[in-house]
């Protein structure tokens, strides 16, 4: 077999550009204005400006694209550049291109609830080359408290009259079903659904997008992807650090609202959904909604909540617990860890537990989907066989691998755990996977909503978790303490075992490329 030749970034971007230009959705010849509402904030500085730069650098934006920052702070483009450029990862050869990029940037200061400020913003955009006819993309990098005023003023004052208009909305999309519906109803009264892009950056990650391809482009998985063969599904999100001085914001929402109700539930949908009629955005999202409608409200008996405490033998931040963060309210009962079991009550998945786990200050950084298969019927190996597992590792080190039994090498005739492994870093050497925001913002330029959350998806997701969240808010149960750097509360392991997950603890992954 001939060795695969790695493509350079220039070649990869060239192929993608060619595909974009040949398609009908990417309006290469049109003028576009990308407006960052909240341009002075952390999200804009660390994610949005760097992402727009990477797309511009790689020639993946329409040529006549302008970037306009808008915020209350009185800043200049130079100020924005000083704040954001450290996150750009610019090489010396890219410096001339960087100057071109910032030449296409401008900044307007104004209030979020003042129509006169938006008239000034609109006049500024109209004055750009072809500005009155330009397609306009508004990225709302703002707290939800100002969404209503901002969207109303955009719709009434700042819309392009001849080009298309799209808005990108960041989570959190409300705090519960009622507030989410209120926000959705307001935005839907101003914009059509095909103009609204509710962004969940996890839907832009390589392996999350790979779930559909793995499932529906491979014959081998179809016959076994059901309750007859799969014992349980575990969806995991782990961070090795705590709030580290940012606990005030986190405390408003907690880990369920921050991670479980959106990131993990979206991954669950991609695992559990039926094959869509096509890869059209609404065909895919229709199937995700069907899954969510089959999930009952989460039961408190199937939930474990935890909060990290300092590790006396740790170092640095690890010695601090959540309540030691000076920005966290005294005596807060907000959970920094949660495990919950959901059931998809349909013919394919009836009785199969979907275990969602997420937490801060844990023993590693990891996000993955793990399908554990049922025991082999008619055991002839004297209970030496462990369950097969299919693992899709989202981060770090993207990979797909299968835990399976093979004969132990040599004179033995005993089964041994091994794996079939596709680690992206080994198979696709020198291929730089794009950041999730790069994929998603490019999707907005192309008008593709497949990887964005539709209003009915959002409504069903909140329906599942709102009763639990209201009960937690009302009763403020004391979360179980767990040590910074541990696997989380042992009660979570007990919950997983109770619903059918088998943790063997005998398997050790060996990187075959380092033998």
Swiss-Prot record:
Binding sites annotated in the UniProt record for NADP(+) 2: 357, 366, 370, 393, 401-403, 421-423, 487, 503, 509
Q: Which residues bind NADP(+) 1?
A: 38-45, 72, 147, 171
Q: Sorted alphabetically, which keywords does the UniProt record give?
A: Acetylation, Carbohydrate metabolism, Cytoplasm, Glucose metabolism, Hydroxylation, Membrane, NADP, Oxidoreductase, Phosphoprotein
Q: Where does this protein hold D-glucose 6-phosphate?
A: 171, 201-205, 239, 258, 360, 365, 395
> What the entry says about post-translational processing?
Acetylated by ELP3 at Lys-403; acetylation inhibits its homodimerization and enzyme activity. Deacetylated by SIRT2 at Lys-403; deacetylation stimulates its enzyme activity.
Q: Where is the active site?
A: 263
Q: Name one GO molecular function term.
A: identical protein binding
Annotated Gene Ontology cellular components are: centriolar satellite; cytoplasmic side of plasma membrane; cytosol; intracellular membrane-bounded organelle
> What Pfam families does the record tag this protein with?
G6PD_C, G6PD_N
Topology in the lipid bilayer is annotated as: Peripheral membrane protein
Q: What is this protein called?
A: Glucose-6-phosphate 1-dehydrogenase
